[in-house]
């Protein structure tokens, strides 16, 4: 099969690289940053933690499909999935809050 280059090591790029590798391609992933994960990062300041990218799996079926099609064990054997309700809560300076 073809030799394939994937630019970036975010979630989508890594999923594409995994699928290409399983299909028989020789895949090389290039990432300009110090770590893989793309926007999935965490910033801490003054005792507070801030997720700078996606922190929830809103569509776990997509990840299950990726694990199955790349020959991995089932998703639930690799990570613990916990339903979160509400998924997010935003509190504004005036005290109002929105839960989603």
Please describe what each predicted stretch is:
Residues 2-100:
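N-terminal glycine-rich phosphate/pyrophosphate-binding loop and immediately adjacent elements
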């Amino acid at each position: 099969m073809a030799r394939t280059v994937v630019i970036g090591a975010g979630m989508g790029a890594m999923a594409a690289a995994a699928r290409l590798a399983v299909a028989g391609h020789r895949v090389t992933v290039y990432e300009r940053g110090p770590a893989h994960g793309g926007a999935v990062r965490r910033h801490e300041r003054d005792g507070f933690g801030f997720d700078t990218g996606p922190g929830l799996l809103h569509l776990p079926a997509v990840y299950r499909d990726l694990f199955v099609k790349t020959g991995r064990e089932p998703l639930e054997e690799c990570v613990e999935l916990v339903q979160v309700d509400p998924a997010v809560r935003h509190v504004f300076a005036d005290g109002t809050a929105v839960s989603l």
